[in-house]
Regions:
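Active-site-proximal alpha-helical
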Residues: 150-179, 186-246
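Active-site recognition of the HExxH zinc-binding catalytic motif
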Residues: 83-96
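Alpha-helical scaffolds flanking conserved acidic
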Residues: 79-83, 182-186
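Alpha-helical structural motif
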Residues: 6, 120-124, 164, 205, ...
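Surface-exposed polar/charged interaction patches
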Residues: 16-20, 143, 239
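Post-HExxH zinc-binding segment in Zn-dependent metallohydrolases
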Residues: 37, 96-151, 155-181
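A metal-dependent hydrolase signature that marks the N-terminal structural subdomain at the beginning
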Residues: 1-80, 312-339
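Non-catalytic terminal regions of proteins
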Residues: 70, 221-339
Length: 339
């Protein structure tokens, strides 16, 4: 893979964007593309830095960077890659602005939604994808708040952090390749109809909330400052009464049972051959897209970092699991497949 060529073409695409026009105060930051052993940053080739993992924003030598793993997520085209890097640059912008409302991935992974919560969310997603007024969407959201407010808060924070970054990335894509953006929005609407998990769904519900707000002429806060954007939008609207559709509740119950069974089978297969280590561990690193929890166990599919009692950090790659303490950020046992 010619990393330098990709880098130069992405840099040219980014130079075409007016960043403050995408979001007030937004400015680009340096970006890097990398493979398992090589990276390009500021136009220079180098060995892959140890802190480069995933597609995200990282702080390296006191500077926020947007990074992209070209092997794990090979781009289809340069405009799409540039828009994805705008998403990651927006996270750097959020850090620089002092954003406080970061979601807790471990709470999201460890908390199972109630059937009614999940069904109302599916109804909300259908309203978003179908073009319903924002007041109807947020009235359904308000109904969920009465069921599991702590879980909804983490989802709404995810929507604010990741959904806003995704929205800004799509605005960039609309300027670089309008046809590609139209396709991305259509696929996003379809994903909302497919009962996505709480984390993944926020990447799609967030942009649609912001798009609908723009269409309805509602002001959106430039720097949320910790309060979810959905809450700030709801205060500007009169919310109607809404009712849960019974068929969605029945479907939610079926889906939850299937998901429980699948998680239990995944954990059973791992525990059958795993070596168990007792201890006091703090979960300090993970791939948030590869976390599943069931019956007090947290499964990780790709990467997990645990701070041990002596202060050292143990890094695990590949499937493993931990038994969670009452606090989902701590674990009392580690299960790693025997080699």
């Amino acid at each position: 893979m010619d990393l330098k060529n990709w880098y130069d073409r992405v840099r040219e695409q980014l130079s075409r964007l007016d960043f403050p026009a995408l979001w007030a105060g937004f400015a680009p930051c340096p970006f890097a593309l990398y493979t398992h052993d090589t990276a390009v940053l500021n136009g220079e080739m180098m060995p892959r830095p140890a802190e480069f993992y995933g597609n995200t924003s990282v702080c390296r030598q006191g500077e926020h960077l947007a990074i992209w793993d070209m092997e794990a997520d090979p781009p289809a085209d340069v405009a799409g890659l540039a828009a994805s890097l705008v998403h990651e640059m927006f996270h750097s912008f959020q850090f620089r602005c002092g954003e406080q409302g970061w979601p807790d991935d471990l709470v999201l992974a460890a908390t199972e939604p109630q059937p009614a919560f999940l069904a109302l969310r599916a109804q909300e997603h259908r309203a978003l994808a179908g073009g319903a007024p924002l007041s109807e969407v947020l009235a359904l959201r308000q109904s969920r708040a009465a069921l599991q407010p702590e879980l909804l808060l983490e989802e709404a924070r995810m929507e604010t952090i990741e959904g806003t970054a995704e929205y800004v990335g799509r605005l960039a894509l609309a300027r670089l390749s309008p046809a590609a953006c139209e396709g991305a929005c259509a696929r996003s609407a379809q994903r909302l109809l497919q009962w996505p998990d709480l984390r993944r769904g926020a990447y799609d519900s967030g942009p649609w909330l912001l798009r609908r707000a723009a269409e309805e002429g509602l002001p959106v806060p430039v720097h949320p400052g910790g309060e979810p954007i959905a809450d700030q939008l709801a205060r500007q609207l009169s919310l109607p009464e809404v009712r849960l559709q019974p068929e969605l509740l029945a479907e939610a119950e079926r889906r939850l049972e299937r998901e429980r069974s699948a998680r239990r089978e995944t954990l059973r297969a791992l525990l059958e051959t795993a070596e168990r280590t007792e201890g006091d561990f703090a979960v300090c690193g993970y791939d948030p897209m590869q976390l599943r929890a069931q019956d007090g166990l947290l499964w990780s599919g790709s990467f997990l970092a645990l701070r041990q009692a002596d202060g050292t950090v143990r890094r695990l790659f590949g499937p493993c699991a931990v038994r969670l303490a009452d606090d989902p950020h701590r674990a009392t046992a580690l299960f790693v497949p025997r080699m």
